[in-house]
């Protein structure tokens, strides 16, 4: 991590972070609803540069079909972005072994997100954290509500871009991954993804309260209040969004100003 990224990461530990998410497939940024019906949103390098200029705290790149398609890592895209963007980059998709973590770090990533491979081989998370440090390792959890109305809330973990049910309880899985060395949990509600109806705040709060590491709330942001709710009601350390940024509804700067006006500590530039 270069000096400017270290400074950005250090400042963000004292504030709530706003993180644009770039879902990538076939070299393009896409956005769907409930993990399907993908719409092209543009070139990843151009979009990353725009969010960097708007004052994003970090960027998250997720190759959403790398694992299901059996493809390699998106190294060329990350190399291009890292040469032009000076905030922390989290990259996920197609990570299968510790050597993949090293390859992405060498390409310019600052943190590596592990999702399907963590379920297939939980020891990968422990090994990667032991070798590279927990601060580099993010475990991504895609969760869908599995409890019926009136029952105690439960959420099931899905892998392979939301295509494969695992039978794992999301809260228990998050707790286990934190114990294995994950430095952050990236928590996406599959039920809310792309719906613009707001985070699943019950899910976000349940996981945030269960783990001793930062939780990044994801899935469902449709307006500025949703971002604030993720922090205040969901108790997330960071909020991640895509649609409201990609299609010009709001800028990162507008989101930060809104949160600051409501007493939420954010990094203003």
UniProtKB/Swiss-Prot annotation:
Q: How does it assemble?
A: Heterodimer of HisH and HisF.
Keywords on record: Amino-acid biosynthesis, Cytoplasm, Histidine biosynthesis, Lyase
Gene source species: Bordetella pertussis (strain Tohama I / ATCC BAA-589 / NCTC 13251)
Query: Is Glycoprotein there in the keyword field?
Result: no
Q: Where in the cell is it found?
A: Cytoplasm
| Metabolic or biological pathway, per its Swiss-Prot or TrEMBL entry | Amino-acid biosynthesis; L-histidine biosynthesis; L-histidine from 5-phospho-alpha-D-ribose 1-diphosphate: step 5/9
Tell me the protein's name: Imidazole glycerol phosphate synthase subunit HisF
This enzyme catalyses: 5-[(5-phospho-1-deoxy-D-ribulos-1-ylimino)methylamino]-1-(5-phospho-beta-D-ribosyl)imidazole-4-carboxamide + L-glutamine = D-erythro-1-(imidazol-4-yl)glycerol 3-phosphate + 5-amino-1-(5-phospho-beta-D-ribosyl)imidazole-4-carboxamide + L-glutamate + H(+)
Q: What positions does UniProt annotate as the active site of this protein?
A: 23, 142
Q: What is its EC number?
A: 4.3.2.10
Q: Which domain of life is it from?
A: Bacteria
Functionally, this protein is described as follows: IGPS catalyzes the conversion of PRFAR and glutamine to IGP, AICAR and glutamate. The HisF subunit catalyzes the cyclization activity that produces IGP and AICAR from PRFAR using the ammonia provided by the HisH subunit.
From the UniProt record, which GO molecular function terms apply? Answer: imidazoleglycerol-phosphate synthase activity; lyase activity
Keyword Amino-acid biosynthesis tagged = yes
Q: Which GO terms describe its cellular component?
A: cytoplasm
Which biological processes are named by the entry's GO terms? L-histidine biosynthetic process
Entry's family note: Belongs to the HisA/HisF family.
């Amino acid at each position: 991590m270069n000096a400017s990224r270290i400074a950005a990461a250090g400042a963000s530990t004292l504030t709530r972070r706003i993180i644009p998410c770039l879902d990538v497939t076939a070299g393009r940024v896409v956005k769907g609803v409930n993990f399907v019906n993908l719409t092209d949103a543009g070139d990843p390098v151009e979009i990353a540069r725009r969010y960097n200029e708007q004052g994003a705290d970090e960027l998250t790149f997720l190759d959403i079909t790398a694992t299901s398609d059996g493809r390699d890592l998106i190294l060329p895209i990350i190399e291009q972005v890292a040469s032009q963007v000076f905030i922390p980059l989290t990259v996920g998709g197609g990570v299968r072994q510790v050597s993949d973590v090293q390859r992405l770090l060498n390409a310019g990533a600052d943190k590596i997100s592990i999702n399907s491979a963590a379920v297939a081989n939980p020891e990968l998370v422990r090994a990667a954290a032991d070798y590279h440090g927990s601060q580099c390792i993010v475990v991504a959890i895609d969760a869908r509500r599995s409890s019926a109305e009136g029952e105690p809330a439960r959420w099931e973990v899905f892998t392979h871009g939301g295509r494969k049910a695992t039978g794992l309880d999301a809260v228990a899985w998050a707790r286990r991954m934190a114990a294995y060395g994950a430095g952050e949990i990236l928590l996406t509600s599959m039920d809310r993804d792309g719906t613009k109806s707001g985070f699943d705040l019950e899910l976000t709060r349940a996981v945030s309260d269960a783990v001793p590491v930062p939780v990044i709330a994801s899935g469902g942001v449709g307006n500025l209040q949703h971002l604030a709710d993720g922090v205040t009601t969901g108790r997330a350390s960071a909020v991640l969004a895509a649609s409201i940024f990609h299609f010009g509804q709001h800028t990162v700067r507008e989101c930060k100003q809104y949160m600051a006006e409501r007493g939420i500590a954010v990094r203003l530039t």
